[in-house]
Regions:
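Bacterial N-terminal signal peptides
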Residues: 25-35
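A structural boundary/capping signal
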Residues: 2-10, 34, 38-239
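N-terminal Sec-pathway targeting helices
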Residues: 17-25
Length: 239
């Protein structure tokens, strides 16, 4: 497993974590890489996606899928900064926030992009997953994207209330400060402009990075099975 570099201003390198956490982190990173390899090598199957969308969600779902495909087609020639803006705006505009219990009758469910577009709703994880997979489809390298679990401060700068949250980080280079794509706010901001977010750990299709937070409310090991299940369902839907 290669040594991963990460912006020291926001997330600390996995090697700075406690030894036990570091060993577990590397094992999880390897498992993420193995179960993600098939997805990374896959190509989009628009016909299959449309057939699945039609059978599950009808004409409304197909209409949004068509809009998503048109957004992708019109964004392919753009630079990466413009691509992340187009994708962020698309999902923040078309998807409404709804919790998993209301949508799926489960306490924690990771929806595929097709499911999220089909019901036009999702929680923070669903927004992030849909944006991540859309940007991979637009050709942004995996190593420039991270799904990041954070503790989000709710109620202003003086508030002591935090909740578990997920955002997408875009890294223009290995040492760059990440730009944060979030469903809580419409604009894309650098991490330094988001003091309301406290990073816990992050991952992508290559591995997982763990910081020093002792207050993590999102166990990385519990997420691996959901990630594997998500990738399997994504493939079945033609992504």
């Amino acid at each position: 497993m290669p040594v991963h570099r990460i912006n020291s201003l926001w997330l600390k390198h996995i090697s700075s974590a406690r030894p036990v956490v570091r060993v577990i982190g590397y094992c999880i990173a390897l498992a993420f890489a193995l179960c993600s390899a098939l997805f990374v090598a896959a190509e989009l199957n628009p016909q299959k996606m449309q057939a699945v969308m039609q059978s599950r969600y009808g004409s409304d779902g197909v209409a949004l899928l068509g809009a998503w495909n048109r957004m992708l087609d019109s964004s392919r020639s753009l630079d990466n900064r413009e691509k992340i803006t187009q994708v962020n705006d698309f999902f923040n505009r078309h998807i409404r926030y709804t919790d998993d219990v209301t949508l799926w009758q489960k306490s924690d469910y990771w929806a595929t992009p097709l499911e999220t577009m089909g019901v036009r709703a999702g929680d923070c994880e669903d927004f992030t997953i849909a944006k991540y997979m859309s940007l991979l489809e637009l050709g942004i390298p995996t190593e420039q994207l991270r799904l990041i679990y954070v503790r989000a401060q709710i109620g202003g700068a003086q508030s002591k209330r935090f909740q578990a949250h997920m955002v997408l980080g875009y890294y223009s280079s290995a040492d760059a400060e990440p730009l944060i794509l979030d469903n809580l706010i419409s604009r894309i901001e650098p991490a330094s402009k988001r003091p309301d977010l406290r990073p816990v750990f992050s991952f992508n299709s290559e591995g997982l990075w763990v910081g020093n937070s002792a207050q993590s409310q999102a166990d990385p090991t519990a997420r691996l099975s959901r990630w594997r299940d998500l990738l399997a369902r994504v493939r079945e839907e033609g992504f």
